[in-house]
């Protein structure tokens, strides 16, 4: 129904208004600018899933970081006032530091009783009719309506012996055995035999705070670990340990993520903490020790699943197929990786968190004068505003719609392109890719289209194979041939002197060379010997 009204609203808008829209105030454009500038992106597409709920962007719990909180005293007013915004909470595989703003206690085997107002019934003694429980004395506002259980006892002067008892939300140390025109709820056996509850904040009973204040909070996430040290935890715990109203706020970019009331501590029949499905959290920029209970952590904004996917592309036609392949790989990774195949820097996450929080603040401020339930209304208006921004971006031509995603183009200078004609020109390959559905077949077709035709190469396949084999094994055969020839030559030189000595010993006898003396360097002795031999 909400989407129909949005489309009707857009259809009635004049086109010049859409073309002259202030894109700097558009949430889709703002998110894209933060992602592009924080990660130095250029010449690519940033695709967002269409937002129909604010949980399309979710908050992640942060592990190790330094955080400087802002502290203040007094009744929180203005920007320090806590107005919750329910957001989706990312599943964390790591333990994160969390803090119980108020300590839990076990209600089992505790003495507890509250009063029933019976004076209006003109009764001087018990019992009070069932259902006439004095809410001002029996429960805190915001807790479920107390269930009245009958309980039998026989105090003197009270007939019949039936009274009623409301389960206590917080323990009291006093006991009044003289009701005097009131029915007292005495200690007895509950239908729920045991349960764990959060204590009320220390400054909850401050006189200047409205009595109808709803205590907010519950368990946050299974990833929470109370034992992990963190500087902000000790500071916040020490600051809130006071009966004086105090508040604390996160720096820009960070938020408090606190457990909602729908998450329950253990009770009879459910020995473990129960969490909502899907996991949600209450987002605050400021919390106080007046109304906040339960478990809180600090977090940042991140995309949900593959809510944001980065597609790389290039301008030249010959490289377009390569961009298509990269896009397919990015989409394939995005289906597996929790961050859409893209790494977000800490600065980017803080800026995204700050932007979404600014939108939430302006949304809450715009409806602050309404007397309706501001918590649920803030979420509805927030959803509608984000959805409207996305639809305005689509109608204005700033984003190209592909596969149910709204894609904005980051130009060569790293800025979000707002020229409709340029966006249309650059979106040609994106639409072609979208028709393929980022499937393996589409990627393979892109690879084949990028390669030239192989028909002309078939006749050359045989010679090319021979040449390839020669290149591979030719050096080995050449080295082997060289070694073989060198070995034969060496053997030939070693046998030659032996043959000469053998021939000389056969031609002349032993007496033939008896007058030969060793040669000197000039050969003179050899010539003299030969002359004597000739004589």
Curated annotation (Swiss-Prot):
Record's protein name: Endogenous retrovirus group V member 2 Env polyprotein
UniProt tissue specificity: Expressed in placenta.
Organism: Homo sapiens (Human)
Signal peptide boundaries: 1-21
Glycan-modified residues: 68
All ranges on the Cytoplasmic side of the membrane: 343-456
Main location: membrane
Top-level taxon of origin: Eukaryota
Family named by the database record: Belongs to the gamma type-C retroviral envelope protein family.
Name of one Pfam family that matches: TLV_coat
Keyword annotations from UniProtKB, A to Z: ERV, Glycoprotein, Membrane, Signal, Transmembrane, Transmembrane helix, Transposable element
Transmembrane segments: 322-342, 457-477
PANTHER family: ENDOGENOUS RETROVIRUS GROUP V MEMBER 2 ENV POLYPROTEIN, VIRAL ENVELOPE PROTEIN
Topology in the lipid bilayer: Multi-pass membrane protein
Protein location: Membrane
Gene Ontology, cellular component aspect: membrane
Extracellular side stretches: 22-321, 478-535
Gene (UniProt): ERVV-2
């Amino acid at each position: 129904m909400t989407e129909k009204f949005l489309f009707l609203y857009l259809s009635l808008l004049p086109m010049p208004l859409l073309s002259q829209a202030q894109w700097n105030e558009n949430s889709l454009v703002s998110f894209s600018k933060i992602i592009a500038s924080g990660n130095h992106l250029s010449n690519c597409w940033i695709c967002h899933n269409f937002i129909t709920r604010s949980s399309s962007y979710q908050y992640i719990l942060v592990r190790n970081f330094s955080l400087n909180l802002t502290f203040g005293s007094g009744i929180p007013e203005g920007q320090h006032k806590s107005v919750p915004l329910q957001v989706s909470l990312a599943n964390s595989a790591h333990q994160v530091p969390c803090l119980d703003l108020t300590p839990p206690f076990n209600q089992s085997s505790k003495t507890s009783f509250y009063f029933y107002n019976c004076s209006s019934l003109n009764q001087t003694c018990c019992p009070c009719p069932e259902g006439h429980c004095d809410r001002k004395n029996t429960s805190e506002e915001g807790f479920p309506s107390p269930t009245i259980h009958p309980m039998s006892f026989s105090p003197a002067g009270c007939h019949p012996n039936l009274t009623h008892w409301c389960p206590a939300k917080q323990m009291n140390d006093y006991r009044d055995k003289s009701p005097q025109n009131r029915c007292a709820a005495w200690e007895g056996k509950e239908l729920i035999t045991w349960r764990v509850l959060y204590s009320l904040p220390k400054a909850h009973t401050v006189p200047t705070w409205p009595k109808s204040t709803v205590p907010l909070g519950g368990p946050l996430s299974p990833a929470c670990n109370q034992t992990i040290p963190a500087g902000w935890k000790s500071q916040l715990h020490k600051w809130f340990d006071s009966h004086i109203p105090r508040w604390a706020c996160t720096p820009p970019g960070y938020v408090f993520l606190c457990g909602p009331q729908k998450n329950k501590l253990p009770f009879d029949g459910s020995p473990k903490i129960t969490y909502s499905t899907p996991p949600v959290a209450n987002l605050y920029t400021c919390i106080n020790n007046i109304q906040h209970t339960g478990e809180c952590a600090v977090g940042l904004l991140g995309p949900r699943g593959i809510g944001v996917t980065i597609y790389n592309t290039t301008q030249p036609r010959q490289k377009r197929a390569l961009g298509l392949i990269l896009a397919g790989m990015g989409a394939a990774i995005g289906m597996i990786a929790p961050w859409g195949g893209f790494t977000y820097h800490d600065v980017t996450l803080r800026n995204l968190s700050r932007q979404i929080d600014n939108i939430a603040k302006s949304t809450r401020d715009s409806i602050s004068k309404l007397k309706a339930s501001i918590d649920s209304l803030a979420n509805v208006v927030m959803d509608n505003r984000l959805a409207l921004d996305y639809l305005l971006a689509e109608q204005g031509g700033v984003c190209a719609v592909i596969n149910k995603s709204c894609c904005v183009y980051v130009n060569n200078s790293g800025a979000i392109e707002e020229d409709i004609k340029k966006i249309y020109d650059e979106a040609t390959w994106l639409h072609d890719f979208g028709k393929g559905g980022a499937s393996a077949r589409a990627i393979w077709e892109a690879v084949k289209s990028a390669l030239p035709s192989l028909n002309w190469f078939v006749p050359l396949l045989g010679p090319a194979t021979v040449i390839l084999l020669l290149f591979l094994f030719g050096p080995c055969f050449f080295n082997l041939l060289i070694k073989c020839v060198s070995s034969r030559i060496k053997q030939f030189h070693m046998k030659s002197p032996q043959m000469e000595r053998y021939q000389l010993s056969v031609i002349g006898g032993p007496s033939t060379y008896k007058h030969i003396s060793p040669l000197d360097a000039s050969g003179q002795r050899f010539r003299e010997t030969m002359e004597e031999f000739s004589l």
